[in-house]
């Protein structure tokens, strides 16, 4: 049964029950009309909420990447939207999702402060041995960028959802298996991939030590695939000077990523 039909049945059932109550109590026709109007308003508002929820869930999840549109493996698509997070954490705190049944990380959301950033930067790195989708063999590759530059090194990184340099922990629930380009783009003068928002956040906090940054990273998986096709990042500074929704693409030019199992095809 569709959501629309289920909602209709629910409203009608409530309406009939209410009318029976009104009839038994000998209430007026105006009371009955009031109940009908209330039911109609409920149906309209519920359908609107369901539509918004469906839209936010599917945003950016197909992972389609165009080198023309996103040569450095990220794309700014609008303003930040933290509605999926519900209540935001307190300043200086990060909230992580628990791993799902496939061992995959979910949404991570925090309110980053200068002190949290410093604590992450000062902390010793302690990376987990493996995460969901980590390949048995991580190939060394050459990736050619649109400007002709080349990267030589490992194809896959343990990519933080919220960077260690922003206070994010080195743990499975804060990491996805990402390509080198998803993690840092071409790693040149202009950071790309996840590094685009991470570098903007660090630079802003260094200039606004009493400010805060709302920051949320959401991996987007297709079905039971272990690797996300994209990671969506929402970032908003307390002064509003940065307010962006960013899609980072988990791919690499010239390679066919095996999103289901990890590695390449």
Map each language-model feature to its residues:
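Bacterial N-terminal signal peptides that target proteins for export
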Residues: 2-13
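Intrinsic structural disorder/low-complexity segments
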Residues: 6-8, 50, 55, 163
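Domain-level detector of nuclease and nuclease-like folds
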Residues: 89-265
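N-terminal, intrinsically disordered, polar/charged segments of Gram-positive cell-envelope systems
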Residues: 32-84
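C-terminal motif of bacterial Sec signal peptides marking the signal peptidase cleavage site
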Residues: 22-26
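Bacterial signal peptide processing site
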Residues: 28-30
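Hydrophobic helical h-region of N-terminal Sec-dependent signal peptides
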Residues: 13-21
């Amino acid at each position: 049964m569709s959501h629309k039909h289920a909602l209709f049945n629910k409203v009608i059932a409530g309406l009939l029950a209410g009318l029976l109550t009104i009839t038994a109590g000998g209430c007026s026709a105006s009371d009955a009309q009031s109940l009908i109007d209330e039911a109609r308003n409920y149906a309209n508002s519920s359908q609107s909420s369901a539509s918004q929820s469906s839209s936010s869930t599917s945003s950016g999840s197909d992972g389609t990447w165009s080198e023309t549109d996103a040569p450095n493996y990220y794309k700014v698509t609008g303003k930040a939207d933290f509605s999926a997070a519900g209540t935001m954490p307190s300043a200086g705190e990060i909230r992580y999702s628990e791993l799902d049944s496939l061992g995959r990380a979910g949404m991570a959301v925090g309110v980053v402060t200068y002190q949290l950033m410093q604590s992450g930067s000062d902390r010793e790195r302690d990376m987990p041995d493996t995460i969901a989708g980590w390949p048995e063999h991580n190939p060394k590759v050459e990736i050619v960028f649109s400007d002709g530059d080349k990267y030589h090194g490992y194809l896959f990184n343990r990519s933080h959802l919220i960077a260690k340099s922003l206070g994010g922990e080195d743990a499975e629930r804060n990491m996805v298996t990402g390509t080198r380009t998803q993690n840092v783009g071409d790693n040149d003068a202009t950071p790309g991939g996840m590094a685009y928002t991470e570098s903007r956040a660090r630079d802003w906090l260094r200039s606004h030590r009493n400010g805060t940054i709302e920051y949320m990273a959401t991996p987007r998986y297709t079905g039971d695939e272990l690797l996300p096709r994209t990671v969506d990042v929402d970032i908003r500074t307390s002064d509003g000077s940065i307010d962006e929704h960013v899609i980072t693409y988990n791919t690499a030019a010239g390679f066919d990523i095996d999103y289901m199992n990890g590695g390449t095809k």
